[in-house]
Amino acid sequence: MKGNSLKKYVLVPFIASLLVFVVYGLLMAQPKAGPASSAVLATADGESPGVRVEVTELKRVSGGTVNLKFVMINDSEKKVDFGYSFVDRSHDVVDFNSIGGVHLIDAAGKKKYFVVRDSEKKCVCSQGLKDLHPKGRMNLWAKFPAPPDNVEKISVVIPHFMPMDDVPIGR
């Protein structure tokens, strides 16, 4: 009788609690649907075969600025060396291994927007970049002064890639 009491009052509730805990844990561990992946606003091929960029965000943000986010994709068999390849030549020393040469062009307003610079004249953009290896991807970003509010589309120019015209500026 004592064995039945143990089963009835201790083991059964313990096993039931354990089962509930395990089932709850399994349910919580199921992958959740995350936010939809970023839409590609524009894409351009590079001078090197198999290398391209995809603009995933161009958006007005606080402080009268615009954030540009893009992905560089290397589907080739050769590495992409950043070095001075993507710099603004007027800032070579501080732009080394950055994308400081990326710019925006408002053709209608005849205005070119350069990457924002900090007090040390460094670009407010992806810096300290390493080589992009074959079959690799790299997320990059840069901050620009915002064009006037009536400018809804702009050209994105990334050195060594075809210009991407009429890229929509989000809010």
Tell me the role of every PLM-derived stretch.
Residues 37-61:
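Low-complexity, acidic Ser/Thr/Pro/Gly-rich terminal tails and inter-domain linkers that flank the onset
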